[in-house]
Regions:
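Extended, charge-rich alpha-helical interface modules
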Residues: 1-95
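N-terminal Rossmann NAD(P)H-binding glycine-rich loop of SDR-like oxidoreductase domains
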Residues: 107, 115
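Hydrophobic/small residue at the entry helix of a nucleotide-binding pocket
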Residues: 110
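NAD(P)-binding Rossmann-fold cofactor-contacting core
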Residues: 120-137
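Short acidic low-complexity segments
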Residues: 136-150
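Rossmann-fold NAD(P) dinucleotide-binding segment
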Residues: 156-191
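Rossmann-fold dinucleotide-binding core
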Residues: 188, 192-245
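Conserved small/polar residues in nucleotide/adenosyl-binding loops
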Residues: 247-249
Length: 249
C-alpha cells in the first residue's frame, strides 16, 4: 500500500495536469471565439452548451463520478470560456481609439465596472471620486476640478450625489457626451431635460445588471432619448455587441 505522502504527490501532479488541460481548453476557446467574430456569430451557442453538458454528464456516469459535480465543473468552464470570448469581442469591436472618458464615481462598484468596460474598448479612462486618497494625472477627488475636454462623461454615483453633479453641470456646462446610470429616473428627468435644452449632449441609461456581472450575454441596457443630437444612439454604439440587448425608450 502506498503511503499518504506518495498519494498526495500523485494528487498534486494530477491537479497540475488538470490546470494545464484547463489552459488548453481556454486557448481552444479563444480560437473558437475568433472564428465566431469573423463569421458574425453570437458569442453564446446554447445548443452547443447543452451538448457539452450532456456529454460530460454521460461520461461521468460511465466512470462512476458524481454527475452533478461534473455538471458544475463544466458550467464553470463554459462560463470562463464565454467570458474570454466576450472580452476579446469587446476589445476587437470597441470604439475607444484613445478617446478620453471621465467616470465620476469610478471607485464605486458600477463606476468601476464602467471604467473597466470602457478601458477594454480602448478609451483612456480617468476617474473622479471623493473617496480617493490622492490625485494624479488620471485620478481626481473633485470632478469639478477636471479639464472639460472629455469625449464622454459618465455619472456613476448614488442618486443624491448624481443630482448635485447634474445641477452643477447645468450651471457650468459640459462639452462632450454625458450620461448617468441611475436606476431611478424620475428625480433626475427634469434636470436632464434642462441640460439637453441648453444644447448639451446628454442621455440616461439603466444597465439591467449589477457590478458583479462579467458575462454580458442576455443582459439588457435601457437607453433614454433626451436630446436632438442623437446622443443616446452614440452611447448605444458603446454597448452594441451581439451579447447585449439594447432597449430604446
Amino acid at each position: 500500500m502506498k503511503d499518504i505522502e506518495t498519494l498526495r504527490k500523485e494528487l498534486s501532479e494530477l491537479d497540475l495536469k488538470i490546470i494545464e488541460l484547463v489552459h488548453r481548453r481556454q486557448v481552444l476557446s479563444e480560437e473558437v471565439g475568433a472564428i465566431k467574430r469573423e463569421k458574425g456569430r453570437p458569442t453564446r451557442d446554447y445548443q452547443r452548451e447543452k451538448l457539452v453538458i450532456e456529454l460530460a454528464k454521460s461520461h461521468a456516469k460511465e466512470l462512476g463520478v458524481d454527475p452533478s459535480m461534473v455538471v458544475d465543473l463544466m458550467q464553470l468552464l463554459i462560463q470562463s470560456s464565454l467570458k474570454t470570448q466576450e472580452s476579446a469581442r469587446v476589445k476587437e469591436e470597441g470604439q475607444g481609439n484613445g478617446k478620453r472618458v471621465l467616470v465620476i464615481g469610478g471607485l464605486g462598484r458600477m463606476g468601476a465596472w464602467f471604467a473597466e468596460f470602457m478601458s477594454m474598448q480602448g478609451y483612456e479612462v480617468h476617474i473622479a471620486d471623493i473617496n480617493l486618497d490622492k490625485e494624479d494625472d488620471s485620478h481626481f477627488i473633485n470632478w469639478a476640478n477636471t479639464n472639460d475636454d472629455y469625449d464622454i462623461t459618465v455619472i456613476a454615483t448614488p442618486l443624491r450625489q448624481s443630482i448635485e453633479i447634474l445641477e452643477k453641470i447645468l450651471e457650468t456646462g459640459r462639452r462632450g457626451m454625458l450620461f448617468d446610470i441611475a436606476s431611478i429616473k424620475s428625480p433626475i428627468k427634469e434636470i436632464l431635460s434642462k441640460i439637453s435644452e441648453k444644447g448639451m449632449k446628454v442621455t440616461s441609461i439603466h444597465p439591467m445588471f449589477g457590478p458583479d456581472t462579467d458575462l454580458l450575454t442576455g443582459k439588457h441596457v435601457v437607453f433614454m432619448n433626451l436630446d436632438d443630437h442623437g446622443t443616446h444612439l452614440e452611447i448605444m454604439k458603446l454597448h452594441d455587441f451581439k451579447m447585449l440587448s439594447l432597449i430604446h425608450i
